[in-house]
Amino acid sequence: MMEVTFLGTSSAVPSKNRNHTSIALRIPGEIFLFDCGEGTQRQMALAGISPMKVTRIFITHLHGDHILGIPGMIQSMGFRGREEPLDIYGPPGIHELHECIMKMGYFTLDFDINVHEVRGGTVVEEDDYRVTSAPASHSVFNLAYCFEEKKRPRFLREKAIALGLKPGPAFGKLHRGIPVRVGDRIIMPEEVLGSPRKGVKVCYSGDTRPCESVIKLAEGAELLIHESTLEAGSEDKAAESGHSTAREAAEVARSAGVKRLILTHLSTRYKRTEVILEAARQVFPVTDVADDLMTVEVKAYDSSPDS
């Protein structure tokens, strides 16, 4: 199961209802953070997400509302006795930011922090997923990120149940290619796996104007998370500041052929999101506006009967 939790959905200034930007992506065995604005670890506590389970942090750009939660996050990990390494990815300047963080306070860490400077292309390559990136169009260098599962066999649930398996951890093991014992019998993965299916794809724009690089990166994604700092009619202001309106974000979603669009990074000047949502849905109907602590499950879009 894959879940996306919106820890913070405000733009440059937080409000009573919206924290600075951060998004948690939960996949089996790992949690990724995309951006880490001020107050992120408190939002994680409210969402029931442990910082100790975060394996990777992906930073889109170095504006304060996207990075100022990192020092506290690292310190809390140290206080709690973390030993597992943490990987941080970001644009040029991310190394200097990390060095500054380590100098500005008292840190006693028993874990390694691996910092990776990213300019685009493949960021992480694992057996079952990859993370890619592309430069977007903001007032400073900004990276859009895309998480994508690699193709894997469909899990034949009904066949597994017929073999005596109950829904639970055994299903996950078999889907990952691990044999499972049921009574005195060992069930092999190939007994309950079908033909390969497309993996889930999730794309996050960071702060950006509508641009071809994000459209290309997000092509065919199950979910596009796109900034919507300004409402429709504010295109000139959005262009000046390197941001997008709700309608522009919807046009990106339509051009990329994504399945669902969720808008985030909302200006505090807008108290009601209905106007933003209406403008976006006129262009791309499958649109929602994120709220803090909102969680959505993301599944692969596959109409095959054995999926």
From Swiss-Prot:
Answer whether the UniProt record assigns the keyword Cytoplasm to this protein.
no
- Pfam family of this protein, just one? Lactamase_B_2
Q: Where are the transmembrane segments?
A: none
Active-site residues are: 65
Q: Which UniProt keywords apply?
A: Endonuclease, Hydrolase, Metal-binding, Nuclease, tRNA processing, Zinc
Q: Matching SUPFAM superfamilies, A to Z?
A: Metallo-hydrolase/oxidoreductase (SSF56281)
The molecular function terms of the Gene Ontology recorded here are: 3'-tRNA processing endoribonuclease activity; zinc ion binding
Which domain of life does the UniProt lineage start with? Archaea
Q: PANTHER family per the record? A: ZINC PHOSPHODIESTERASE ELAC PROTEIN 1 (PTHR46018:SF2)
What exactly does this protein do?
Answer: Zinc phosphodiesterase, which displays some tRNA 3'-processing endonuclease activity. Probably involved in tRNA maturation, by removing a 3'-trailer from precursor tRNA.
Which protein family is it in? Belongs to the RNase Z family.
Provide the protein name: Ribonuclease Z
According to its UniProt entry, this protein's organism is Methanothermobacter thermautotrophicus (strain ATCC 29096 / DSM 1053 / JCM 10044 / NBRC 100330 / Delta H)
Q: What is the lineage of its organism?
A: Archaea, Methanobacteriati, Methanobacteriota, Methanomada group, Methanobacteria
Designated gene of the protein: rnz
